[in-house]
Amino acid sequence: MKFEDRILNKSIPEWKFYNINYEKLKVAIKKVTAYDYDNPNDSGMEKLLNQCSVAFDQEFQNVNLFVSLKIKEISTRILSVESSIIDFSKGLNKTSRNRFNLRKLKIINAHVDDCNFELQLLSRFLIIQRIALRKLFKKLLNEFPQDSENPLTASEYVTSIRNSESLRNGHEGISFMKLDLDPYLLEVSLIVDVLHDLENKLEDATEPAVEQRSLNRSDESAHTSSSPEANNSSLPASPRSIPLLSNKKTSKMIDSSLEFDTALIDKAENLGRFLLSSEDIEGLKFMLLNIGFRIIDDSIISTSKEILDTTDNINSAGNKSIRSAKSFNDLQHTLSLSKQKNILPSAVQSNEKYVSISILDTVGNEGSPLLLTDDNINQHPNMIVSSTAEDTCIVMCHVGGLRNHVVTNDLLLRDVKNILSAMRSGNDTKNISALINSLDPSPISKIALEWIQSHRLKTIEPKLDFKRTRFISADNGDIYLIALDESITIGNVSTLPFPILEIKKLSRSSGLSQTAINEDNKFKQLMKSVVTNEFQCSLIPPDLTTWKICLELVHSNELQNDLFQLLLRDQYKLNSDDSLSPDEFFQLGKDRLEEEFDLTGPINNSQGSVDSGRRVRIHKKSKQSDNETKKKPIRYWNEFDEQEEDNLDNAFYIDTNGSRSTTDNEESLLLRNSPPDYGFILFSRNFINRTYDFCEKLRNLIRHDKKTSPDLFQNSKHPHCSSTNYGSVASFGSQSTSASYDDVQRYLQYQQQDIEDSQSIYEYRHDEVVTFLYLSALLTSCIMASVCLGIVLSLFRGQSNNEIDLEIQNILIAIIIISLLVSLILICACLLLLFSRFTLAPIWHYVGCFTMFFSVTGTVCYGMIEIFF
């Protein structure tokens, strides 16, 4: 498919007429590149270049005009929402119904969602325009003619277009190439935080009101219960994409960037790590806001709290100073003019705060850190996480053992640097210990500092610096953390060309298996949103953490190609000289993402065949070769196998997902995954077991079977019980015999239960129950058809139809018709049940069932003919 058609397919349908006219610019470029110097009829080269520049300039002006108007429209709506929040905050202290206030919040939240959705569409629109322009520039650079009559080079001409007034400054200072939507993202996130805090404030105000209402007189309470205020327990969830959080406990567990980063590297379970295309960063951020995630930013959190704290001051300031406030910024300016305390901060600044990671290792491991060879250390290495804007830091030490690692965030960065500097200077151990004790650290912090001291750890190169955007969402008691790391710089030398998206979960249950991760509803919703919005991303293997990727690529000369080789080495066979383009790499990532999480992306023919346009042939590694390289589980002398010798390679463990051992959930899942039932009629396992037990009880009742054979252990127990024992030794022996008997009985019960739960026993019971059902249906159908046939013959053949005079003739005919139809349904169900067995039935079952089927069918047809004709 042509590139211009791909632009139309990817663009927003309502805005497709505002896209860059790719076809028009391509024709202008083609005239320049196809210039024939030998043809005197062709126009001059300079004229063609001017025409091409004018065409570019016109398209830039059109796109810039639309973007300028759209961003101003969104800004106006955001200011209107902020003004509504200010008015709402001013009226909170007045007497008003909480249900009415919550409804107002819901309406404001709907407008916020509209603004966020418009920003997401605008982000997608800008990405499409930038891709189209980059494609056009690439075409110019590759096909630009060079001749003595045209001394201008391709790069110079493209640079002149890039530096044009319409592209640099845009329309009224807004250019689609330079427009940054991050400030709008922070502003929307601030509004969402204020709405959450206002909702929590309303809920807190409702609780004492309910207590006071319970102390009122009975007539007043009766009147109150009938009023709308009594039914304000909760409003239905907002149908919009940005929900109002009602769970205050989960939303306040992590309320700072420091706590977020601590939880991210400490107790959070990894759900997935992805390499994201740089073009989809802004769109992904707005999409996360749409599906209920909130941004964790210290400036936003502090601003939200201070806005709520100013409610009383706003009310006391008078209408004169508040009347003209149209936004949070105007409100702060108005309050400063009235010489009040500077209680509201200025606009939420998008000042770039970078996160730094310094890896700690022992002396001599600078060239090959331990985390490159040990995956346990790789997941929780010795490192220091700090921020450029704060003096606090996070220290993590891999101590091993049951604790595995310790993490602390109550140390100052300068104190940790002083200790590391003292160790490098060769200070005495006692002096360093005294320095540690002088800090008065917490127990965990002291363990971390003493670990650094005892193992003589020091910072190694390279140092990692990156910009981090944090998102959080609470769902069913679980907290989901998303970290988007951009501009990852490796030792101030090189920068990763793509950001890394990391998704983790603070779960109530630890140790998530891969099956549990893939079945996580929130994570699955997130992955579906990524595929639906056509974001380009690729799943990173779990063993490749951000710091390991950077350490692997620290000496790379071709960073992008080596990064692709590193991420694909476990799934695909690539030669060292193979070079993938970003589109090819992310297409492979999309295929794996859909396969890994059982997702189906939108049908997009614009992508074309992946293999058809690929410059490098890629062969996927077979899973069999991967399984062969895995180590077999270690067997010990006291392990016994009760399975067949050829089952699971004589392994004691049930080895699933390539792990050394399995959890109880995985074993139960493996046992539940029985061979599928392909019968015509399917039954639940519970129904089969209950029906079989009922049939057994009925059979025993008919045969008058009784349990006449006592247990072997019960017979052997009576002689010991009948004999008289004296003394403590005899008494102890009697008690131990009784205890061992109970243990054996319980063991036999468990063993019997395991046997009954096995697949072979279930198949046997299934066939027995199905046999009982189809034989019963066969017998019932034959009896009903025979009785109906006798009645029909006696009524319609015994005498003439005109002589039949019965008062209940119509009722009798209806009963006969219904009985014939029921017998036909039963005989059909009999055949379906016959072919629903796991094993083949005896041959006489098939002969008898088919014979009776044709007989009953003929009887039904004959009866219907006699009745109606």
UniProtKB/Swiss-Prot annotation:
<feature type="modified residue" description="Phosphoserine">
    <location>
        <position position="238"/>
    </location>
</feature>
<dbReference type="GO" id="GO:0033254">
    <property type="term" value="C:vacuolar transporter chaperone complex"/>
</dbReference>
<dbReference type="GO" id="GO:0000329">
    <property type="term" value="C:fungal-type vacuole membrane"/>
</dbReference>
<feature type="region of interest" description="Disordered">
    <location>
        <begin position="599"/>
        <end position="629"/>
    </location>
</feature>
<dbReference type="InterPro" id="IPR004331">
    <property type="entry name" value="SPX_dom"/>
</dbReference>
<feature type="modified residue" description="Phosphoserine">
    <location>
        <position position="241"/>
    </location>
</feature>
<dbReference type="GO" id="GO:0030643">
    <property type="term" value="P:intracellular phosphate ion homeostasis"/>
</dbReference>
<feature type="modified residue" description="Phosphoserine">
    <location>
        <position position="612"/>
    </location>
</feature>
<keyword id="KW-0472">Membrane</keyword>
<keyword id="KW-0597">Phosphoprotein</keyword>
<keyword id="KW-0926">Vacuole</keyword>
<feature type="modified residue" description="Phosphoserine">
    <location>
        <position position="668"/>
    </location>
</feature>
<feature type="modified residue" description="Phosphoserine">
    <location>
        <position position="324"/>
    </location>
</feature>
<dbReference type="GO" id="GO:0006799">
    <property type="term" value="P:polyphosphate biosynthetic process"/>
</dbReference>
<feature type="modified residue" description="Phosphoserine">
    <location>
        <position position="316"/>
    </location>
</feature>
<feature type="transmembrane region" description="Helical">
    <location>
        <begin position="772"/>
        <end position="792"/>
    </location>
</feature>
<dbReference type="GO" id="GO:0005783">
    <property type="term" value="C:endoplasmic reticulum"/>
</dbReference>
<feature type="transmembrane region" description="Helical">
    <location>
        <begin position="849"/>
        <end position="869"/>
    </location>
</feature>
<comment type="subunit">
    <text>The VTC core complex is an integral membrane heterooligomer composed of the catalytic subunit VTC4 and the accessory subunits VTC1, VTC2 and VTC3. The complex exists in 2 different sub-complexes: VTC1-VTC2-VCT4 and VCT1-VTC3-VTC4. The VCT1-VTC3-VTC4 subcomplex is mostly found on the vacuolar membrane. The VTC1-VTC2-VCT4 subcomplex is observed in the cell periphery, probably ER and nuclear envelope, but localizes to the vacuole under phosphate starvation. Each subunit contains 3 transmembrane helices. VTC1 is a small membrane protein without hydrophilic domain.</text>
</comment>
<feature type="compositionally biased region" description="Polar residues">
    <location>
        <begin position="223"/>
        <end position="236"/>
    </location>
</feature>
<feature type="topological domain" description="Vacuolar">
    <location>
        <begin position="793"/>
        <end position="810"/>
    </location>
</feature>
<comment type="function">
    <text>Regulatory subunit of the vacuolar transporter chaperone (VTC) complex. The VTC complex acts as a vacuolar polyphosphate polymerase that catalyzes the synthesis of inorganic polyphosphate (polyP) via transfer of phosphate from ATP to a growing polyP chain, releasing ADP. VTC exposes its catalytic domain VTC4 to the cytosol, where the growing polyP chain winds through a tunnel-shaped pocket, integrating cytoplasmic polymer synthesis with polyP membrane translocation.</text>
</comment>
<feature type="transmembrane region" description="Helical">
    <location>
        <begin position="811"/>
        <end position="831"/>
    </location>
</feature>
<dbReference type="InterPro" id="IPR051572">
    <property type="entry name" value="VTC_Complex_Subunit"/>
</dbReference>
<feature type="modified residue" description="Phosphoserine">
    <location>
        <position position="609"/>
    </location>
</feature>
<feature type="region of interest" description="Disordered">
    <location>
        <begin position="205"/>
        <end position="242"/>
    </location>
</feature>
<feature type="topological domain" description="Cytoplasmic">
    <location>
        <begin position="1"/>
        <end position="771"/>
    </location>
</feature>
<feature type="modified residue" description="Phosphoserine">
    <location>
        <position position="327"/>
    </location>
</feature>
<keyword id="KW-0812">Transmembrane</keyword>
<protein>
    <recommendedName>
        <fullName>Vacuole transporter chaperone complex subunit 5</fullName>
    </recommendedName>
</protein>
<feature type="modified residue" description="Phosphoserine">
    <location>
        <position position="760"/>
    </location>
</feature>
<keyword id="KW-1133">Transmembrane helix</keyword>
<feature type="topological domain" description="Cytoplasmic">
    <location>
        <begin position="832"/>
        <end position="848"/>
    </location>
</feature>
<feature type="domain" description="SPX">
    <location>
        <begin position="1"/>
        <end position="154"/>
    </location>
</feature>
